[in-house]
Amino acid sequence: MQHDDTIAAIATPLGQGGIGIIRISGPASLEVLRALFRPSSSRFGGFRPWTLHHGTITDGCDPLDDVLAVHMPGPRTFTGEDVSEIHCHGGSGVLAAVLEACVRHGARYAERGEFTRRAFLNGRMDLTQAEAVAEMIAAPSREGMRLAQAKLDGLLGQRVGALRARLDALRMQLCVAVDFPEEEVECLAPEAFLAEIEAVRQGVVELSAGYARTRCWQDGALVVLAGQVNAGKSSLMNALLGRRRAIVTDLPGTTRDFIEEPLNLSGLAIRLADTAGLRETGDIVEQEGVRMSRDLVAQADLVLLVTDATQGLQGPELELLRHAGPERVLVVFNKTDLLEGRILPSTPEGCRSVHVAAASGDGVESLVTAIRAAVLAATGAGEPEAGELAPNMRQAAALDKAATILDELAGDIRAHVPYDLCGVRLDGACAALMDVTGQSTPEAILDAIFASFCIGK
């Protein structure tokens, strides 16, 4: 991919809206803008940097839209390059026409994430900040936004950089010990060396643990409604959503395919999935639905095992509970309004449970509270703290690699392995930390990261 030409893309969501923005970045961005822009004021004397100008975008003699346009010279721009923006009306036809005109006058269509990639390549941000751009856009909750903002501010990259600097200092001392063995290097005494290695390793481990603690706040959690047919799973989904989303009938097996909807529980974003009832069936379509239900249960952060309170837990439900594990299951006794004075069914030891009547809404508020607490417990998450750093899966994997290498290095030091060989391990740990911030990340990995971005970002 070329990185020194001029690119253009629609930077706002597609569809109809009041405003749509075309972003142009690269050495010819001002020339492209000048070729298309016709000012509305006779006093227009050229584009003043960072100033919006009113006018018309024309393609030849054909006026396309009434716009505001701005030019921002590099390097103090998002990409570090010269950047121009055209603020149009937000119709998809208008935006497509203006973008095509930009391409005809010297720009090319931007690839996914190419603006942010250029910002990274031009040193405007490290890779943790670049990834945080996409994480901020996709943040499912205010807490997720705060976690992404901390990375956008560079806090994760700074913490990783500080740990790597400590390893660099150790590497320098190793080099001195190897090159000048007759010199006394006091700080390279095995005890002091091991203490510093362990301190850095502990810092790396603590950073990596932030992924597990915050994953559900960053990505949301998958909560699956499962159970036998006619247990009231679809009614419960509708009650939780506060609207009729799933079809509800008295016929067993009404739900065959799974339905997934987003739900925000006091800042915790979940993906709520209603699944086909678990039973043996000769219907091929329903069989596939049951198979998909079992797959979703295996993937779920939390399973809401919905059972008819008038029947209690039956064999298939107990089997699901055994396979999923009680730590990932919240038993929901539904239809409590039909008990008519009978004793509430018991819950197996070690299981959490809640009682509701989805048809009337009784107990749903308590269920919402229970779901939120159960998700946090099942994922090992807690309420995000001020200054919490939340690496994503890729970053956590690189941190784990660094921690493993440092652990191996400590073993080498205890075994009196020569310093030059220890230096190889130290280089590996430094390289793993550099992967977090993108200083040594292969091009193929960068391609994969930025391919997940939207076009125009």
Curated annotation (Swiss-Prot):
GTP binds at residues 230-235, 249-255, 274-277. It is found in: Cytoplasm. This is tRNA modification GTPase MnmE. The gene is mnmE. GO terms for biological process: tRNA methylation; tRNA wobble uridine modification. Residues 220-376 form the TrmE-type G domain. It comes from Nitratidesulfovibrio vulgaris (strain ATCC 29579 / DSM 644 / CCUG 34227 / NCIMB 8303 / VKM B-1760 / Hildenborough) (Desulfovibrio vulgaris). Pfam families: MMR_HSR1, MnmE_helical, TrmE_N. Homodimer. Heterotetramer of two MnmE and two MnmG subunits. The keyword Nucleotide-binding applies. (6S)-5-formyl-5,6,7,8-tetrahydrofolate binds at residues 23, 85, 124, 457. Mg(2+) binds at residues 234, 255. InterPro entries: G_TrmE, GTP-bd, GTP-bd_TrmE_N, GTPase_MnmE, MnmE_dom2, MnmE_helical, P-loop_NTPase, Small_GTP-bd.
